Amino acid sequence: MNAPQTNDTAADGAATEAIAADSGRRALTRREQKEAYENNKLFKRIARQVGQAIGDYNMIEAGDKVMVCLSGGKDSYAMLDVLLRLRERAPIDFDIVAVNLDQKQPGFPEHVLPEYLTQIGVPFHIENQDTYSIVKRLVPEGKTTCSLCSRLRRGILYRVAGELGATKIALGHHRDDILQTLLLNMFYGGKLKGMPPKLQSDDGRNVVIRPLAYVKETDLEKYAELREFPIIPCNLCGSQPNLKRAEMKALIREWDKRFPGRVDNMFSALANVVPSHLMDTGLFPFASLRATGVADPLGDIAFDEEPCASGDATGDAAGNTTSGAARPISIVQFDDL
């Protein structure tokens, strides 16, 4: 699917409408005008990044039925909201169905999502499965339940996708999730592995997409506040948060504050891989490498300092650098669906 176009006239002025409705027909103050302008810019930025990711990885094709997995958190709400708006001006036709898995966690507000989805007119399916009791029975007290819960949830959602005739399963992972996963796998797993923007599921029957792959979490936080989504708490199961992932989140946010451009460059690096300069013999034939006598401009310059080592290059959220040609950027489980 080609990335849907976003422009000043077509972009949704959600903030402007909200403020205008709130203030009747009176003229907006300068502050309100500025807020409306900034919020409109926020939507356009998110919509542009989602559209770009969809286009870069051909996430959605004509005739697709996209199953949007809706947890009740800010990310999945934003994903559904933006996909619905992009569909209005997309060059192709595709269907959207929202799916929530009610795992029967104590205190889960069953009415929230059905009421919201009915209000906005989106076809939806609520899958009721008491995985909470299964996890509590199998996992010792005090141990994290996230891994087993994730596997159960994944299997159920794959089955539901088949029953609904969905051709794509959309998950709400964003740019920060991808970078956190990369660091977790490097620091604790000994792997250079991230979270792909598009993949075939482990059962071989589904294609999973991550339309928010280019979007910063801070933008999603602002967008959720602006749109006033009815957020459902994510810790109803009582499980302890993933402390290692929380560490990675804090690390990335600290870098973003102290070293502008560093996190963007990290993300850009995921799409600029040079196998010959890594150490995986499965990716590059080091054993058979011989001098050919033919100059190779991409060959290793051995004793010279790499140009990028100076730290002069800075990247943006779309993966473009100021020290070289602009390139489309890639995306990327510690295993949490």
From Swiss-Prot:
> Which reaction is catalysed here?
cytidine(32) in tRNA + S-sulfanyl-L-cysteinyl-[cysteine desulfurase] + AH2 + ATP = 2-thiocytidine(32) in tRNA + L-cysteinyl-[cysteine desulfurase] + A + AMP + diphosphate + H(+)
Pathway membership, UniProt: tRNA modification
User: In the record's cofactor note, how is the cofactor described as bound?
Assistant: Binds 1 [4Fe-4S] cluster per subunit. The cluster is chelated by three Cys residues, the fourth Fe has a free coordination site that may bind a sulfur atom transferred from the persulfide of IscS.
Binding-site residues for [4Fe-4S] cluster, renumbered to this chain: C146, C149, C237
CDD domains cross-referenced by the UniProt entry = TtcA-like
Query: Could you identify this protein by its name?
Result: tRNA-cytidine(32) 2-sulfurtransferase
GO (cellular component) term, any one: cytoplasm
State the organism named in the record.
Answer: Burkholderia vietnamiensis (strain G4 / LMG 22486) (Burkholderia cepacia (strain R1808))
> According to its UniProt record, where is this protein located?
Cytoplasm
